[in-house]
């Protein structure tokens, strides 16, 4: 504190005040502090010390009278009958004793303790000059008792006396002293001794508690305060139990009359009381007394001792003027007896409401009590009202989320015909069903667009090393609107001629060198497919792009994939540049295109919007320079940058399995520099880069930001769209890859289980309709993106009656292993833009495996749908034949014959008829007899009359309508039953 700065909490310790009191003084003195850890200057500290001696917070003032009553009642019950007359005195003295008085007595005691003789009562009277300000409050407390006590009160009895080795000798003198002297001196010694004993207990109680239980002893203690004093520890064992300390204060008035019964040789030195915590101490004391009543535990718990210490200071102040030190020392020993042997009947009543808290906080530190505390702590969780399921989870995780037992979930699922164990993973649908079974609402997670950028490639460390990078431009739009042709015109190549069917079916990444403002520059173009099946590819292209070029044909306008491309670009939050293509055609209507785009929120600049629209002709190469200039202009506004001086990060654009080179992946480097020999992790795939090839087929040694290259050296084909990162440590990279691979494996197993899982209800339904049909497929494609597109298209096919099971889907050529798998499972091999390995076709012919090859996704989907329909059993449907009206009824034998006129179609013998009378069908069955002019005929066409007879129906009436129909078998479709 002699330094230039003083902390608030140090000042509060010095003044024996709480931190909040010091903060109040700071507020009054306009000293800017934030908390108890704030620092102030020594001058400001002096001001606070000055005001602290004059004015202290009086918040606890109103609490003292109430608490004093509690102590009085409790003390009366615990102590002998002789204490009652003294209780009234203590009550009046406490009521008249202000809160500020207690606080004012704190500091002088500790900082300037007077030396005194062995006799405790007489010693406080020897040093009245140390703190005249504090003697005045003491006089107030003693004044109700007697006039002779008033002169003794001004003397600083409560000021901390120096430690003395032999306080016991003063104890016998205390009972012999005059009443006035005993009361006044005991007020000081009582508070002194108790506070000191409590502070002593904080440090030494754990070791001395067992010794002091049978008999109170005087032990020298070192107080928390600067001045060391000696304290009596008659019940150190009880002190951690706050009720003992409180009991002393409560019982102090009554104990005064019974000193002869106790060994009164234990005077207590007064230490500055802290009345501000008295209320807390009293509550804990009551709790502790109740806990001791039910169970004896003498071990100390330090947190409680600290609270008792502080609170005890406050309570002793109230009884300062009345209680001699001898009576206090006598009062403390009986507490353990009442707690251990026979609890006093009076104490439980006020502390009963706090009994549970008492057991937990201060009943002792024994292992048995801790076990009881754990048992008494029922950790019962209630299920949440609603949960959000974002991914698959194990049954145990689901049980934790729902706060229910795993066995309950297993039981519920088993009752629904789903057998599962505790380690299995629940798919989303099953988890949702489980939650609903337990009345927990499931909130569907917010579906994020696949084009939304989820990962920030730049780190904080990169911000100081950023450099400009070329823009990545994605060409998007509807199929056949000229995206690849536009890119060809820019690159002056012929990519589109090599596309099957003239449509792009994978992403191509290309670099274009251009000159802008006299400086060479580069643009990286990503060409995405426009067919509806390649939504994932378009989303992936938009996710990694900086600028999106939306190609719209001037003669076709906005189409479905155009709208989807707009949504992808908006989800990725990238600027859009519209290229209105095919301006060289006669039917070009650029204004109509602009109008349609305006309806989608893309208003051209010439119309007052912010979207750049450039009319171009990809075939003739018209206006391409303007388009490139606009791209560079937008890229300058975007301020594209990256840090090339770090390990590379980026995204997998495409991946496939090459027959000669193995797994090949096309990467877009988004940050850092990729080099040959780097350890790379892409999703769950790890590898070491053996070679890198540019888009023009040239080998390169490194790839800077915004460059797309093909790499060789991966362990397997990664998933397109996965992000990759280069690691300096192969061990770290392998650990990350293995962890991701395990998660992917679990997910794949769960999907396989969910696709094969059947419930009891579904089994019964299949038993009624026949076995559920399955179409097994082995799918091989050229690149990973094509595999994704095909799988997505297959999932959109209706599979209510025929289920598609893809046993294997991977990029690469068709091998003999694939043929063996198809032969064992009765599957069809689908090859998309791929070839057959040597020996695969011969093996397929020997095994009788059907291999279908496609290069356009349209035909593939049509044939797959036809194969699924071929597995369906033909359906018998009703086909109408004709309609006739009954105009006469002729009785024949026992029955009758209807004379009819065929109104439409024809009526055929041995076919089915339905007789309607009004809106009611009176007969539905076979037509047994058909005659025309008394001759049996096979059929009668419309416009002719005929006679119709039925063996099982003869109640014809004129006006009946006869509907003729027949049942025929027709091929069923996946859309539904044929009608």
Curated annotation (Swiss-Prot):
PROSITE patterns: G_TR_2 (PS51722). Residues 502-506 are annotated as: G2. Keywords: Cytoplasm, GTP-binding, Initiation factor, Nucleotide-binding, Protein biosynthesis. Residues 263-278, 294-303 have a biased composition (Basic residues). Residues 33-391 are annotated as: Disordered. Belongs to the TRAFAC class translation factor GTPase superfamily. Classic translation factor GTPase family. IF-2 subfamily. This is Translation initiation factor IF-2. It comes from Picosynechococcus sp. (strain ATCC 27264 / PCC 7002 / PR-6) (Agmenellum quadruplicatum).
């Amino acid at each position: 504190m002699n330094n230039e700065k003083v902390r608030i909490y140090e000042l509060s310790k010095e003044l024996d005040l709480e931190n909040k009191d010091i903060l109040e003084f700071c507020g009054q003195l306009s000293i800017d502090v934030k908390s108890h850890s704030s620092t102030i200057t020594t001058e400001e500290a002096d001001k606070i010390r000055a005001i602290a001696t004059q004015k202290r917070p009086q918040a606890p003032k109103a609490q003292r009278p109430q608490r004093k009553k509690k102590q009085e009642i409790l003390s009366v019950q615990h102590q002998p009958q002789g204490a009652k007359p003294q209780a009234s005195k203590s009550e009046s003295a406490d009521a008249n004793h202000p809160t500020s008085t207690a606080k004012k007595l704190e500091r002088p005691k500790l900082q300037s303790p007077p030396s005194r003789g062995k006799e405790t009562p007489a010693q406080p009277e020897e040093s009245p000059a140390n703190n005249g300000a504090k003697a005045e409050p003491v006089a107030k407390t003693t004044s109700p008792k007697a006039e002779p006590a008033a002169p003794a009160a001004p003397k600083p009895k409560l000021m901390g006396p120096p430690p003395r080795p032999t306080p016991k000798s003063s104890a016998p003198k205390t009972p012999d002293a005059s009443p006035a002297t005993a009361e006044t001196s005991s007020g000081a010694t009582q508070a002194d001794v108790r506070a000191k004993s409590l502070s002593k207990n904080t440090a030494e109680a754990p070791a001395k508690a067992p010794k002091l239980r049978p008999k109170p002893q005087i032990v020298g203690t070192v107080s928390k305060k600067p001045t060391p004093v000696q304290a009596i520890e008659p019940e150190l064992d009880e002190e951690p139990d706050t009720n003992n300390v409180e009991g002393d204060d409560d019982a102090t008035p009554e104990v005064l009359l019974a000193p002869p019964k106790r060994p009164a040789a234990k005077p207590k030195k007064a230490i500055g009381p802290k009345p501000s915590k008295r209320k807390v101490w009293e509550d804990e004391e009551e709790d502790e007394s109740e806990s001791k009543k039910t169970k004896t535990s003498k071990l100390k718990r330090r947190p409680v001792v600290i609270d008792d210490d502080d609170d005890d200071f406050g309570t002793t102040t109230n009884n300062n003027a009345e209680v001699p030190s001898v009576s206090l020392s006598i009062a403390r020993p009986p507490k353990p007896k009442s707690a251990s042997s026979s609890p006093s009947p009076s104490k439980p009543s006020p502390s009963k409401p706090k009994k549970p808290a008492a057991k937990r906080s201060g009943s002792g530190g024994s292992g048995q009590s801790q076990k009881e505390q754990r048992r008494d702590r029922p950790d019962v969780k209630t299920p949440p009202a609603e949960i959000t399921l974002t991914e698959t989870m194990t049954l145990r995780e689901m049980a934790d989320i729902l706060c229910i037992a795993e066995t309950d979930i297993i039981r519920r699922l088993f009752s629904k015909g789903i057998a599962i164990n505790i380690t299995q993973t629940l798919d989303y649908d099953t988890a949702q069903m489980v939650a609903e079974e337990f009345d927990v609402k499931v909130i569907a997670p917010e579906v994020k667009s696949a084009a939304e950028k989820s990962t920030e490639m730049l780190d904080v460390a990169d911000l100081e090393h950023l450099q400009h990078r070329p823009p990545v431009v994605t060409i998007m739009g509807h199929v056949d609107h000229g995206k690849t042709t536009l890119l060809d015109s820019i690159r002056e190549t012929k990519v589109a001629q090599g596309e099957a069917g003239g449509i792009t079916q994978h992403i191509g990444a290309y670099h274009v060198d251009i000159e802008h403002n006299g400086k060479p520059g580069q643009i990286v173009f990503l060409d995405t497919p426009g067919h509806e099946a390649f939504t994932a590819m378009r989303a992936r292209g938009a996710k990694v792009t900086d600028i999106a070029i939306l190609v719209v044909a001037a003669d076709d306008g906005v189409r479905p994939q155009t709208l989807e491309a707009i949504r992808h670009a908006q989800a990725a939050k990238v600027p859009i540049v519209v290229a209105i293509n095919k301006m060289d055609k006669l039917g070009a209507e650029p204004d109509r295109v602009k109008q349609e785009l305006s309806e989608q929120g893309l208003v051209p600049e010439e119309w007052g919007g912010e979207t750049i629209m450039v009319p171009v002709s990809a075939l003739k190469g018209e206006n391409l320079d303007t388009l490139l200039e606009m791209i560079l202009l937008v890229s300058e506004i975007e301020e594209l940058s990256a840090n090339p001086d770090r390990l590379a990060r980026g995204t997998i654009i495409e991946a496939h399995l090459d027959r000669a080179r193995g797994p090949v992946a096309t990467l877009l480097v988004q940050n850092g520099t990729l080099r040959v020999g780097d350890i790379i992790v892409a999703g769950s795939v790890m590898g070491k880069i053996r070679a890198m090839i540019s888009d023009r087929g040239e080998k390169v040694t490194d790839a800077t930001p915004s460059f797309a290259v093909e790499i060789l050296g991966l362990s397997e084909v990664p998933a397109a769209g996965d992000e990759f990162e280069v690691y300096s440590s192969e061990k770290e990279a392998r650990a990350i890859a293995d962890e991701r691979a395990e998660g992917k494996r679990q997910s794949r197993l769960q999907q396989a289980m969910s696709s094969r899982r059947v419930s009891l209800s579904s089994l019964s339904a299949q038993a009624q309709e026949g076995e559920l049909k399955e179409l097994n497929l082995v799918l091989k494609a050229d690149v990973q993106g094509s595999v994704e597109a095909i799988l997505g298209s297959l999932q959109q096919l209706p599979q209510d009656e025929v289920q598609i099971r893809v046993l294997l889907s991977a990029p690469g050529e068709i091998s003999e292993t694939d043929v063996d798998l198809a032969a064992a499972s009765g599957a069809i091999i689908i090859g998309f833009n791929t070839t057959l390995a040597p020996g695969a076709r011969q093996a397929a012919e020997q095994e009788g495996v059907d291999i279908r090859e496609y290069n356009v996704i349209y035909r593939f989907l049509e044939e797959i749908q036809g194969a699924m329909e071929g597995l369906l059993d033909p359906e018998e449907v009703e086909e109408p034949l004709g309609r006739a009206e009954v105009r006469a009824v002729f009785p024949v034998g026992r029955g009758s014959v209807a004379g009819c006129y065929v109104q439409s179609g024809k009526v055929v013998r041995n076919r089915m008829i339905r007789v309607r009378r009004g809106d009611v069908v009176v007969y539905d069955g076979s037509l047994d007899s058909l005659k025309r002019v008394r001759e049996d005929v096979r059929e009668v066409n419309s416009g002719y009359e005929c006679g119709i007879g039925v063996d099982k129906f003869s109640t014809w009436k004129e006006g009946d309508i006869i509907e003729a129909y027949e049942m025929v078998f027709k091929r069923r479709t996946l859309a539904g039953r044929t009608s």
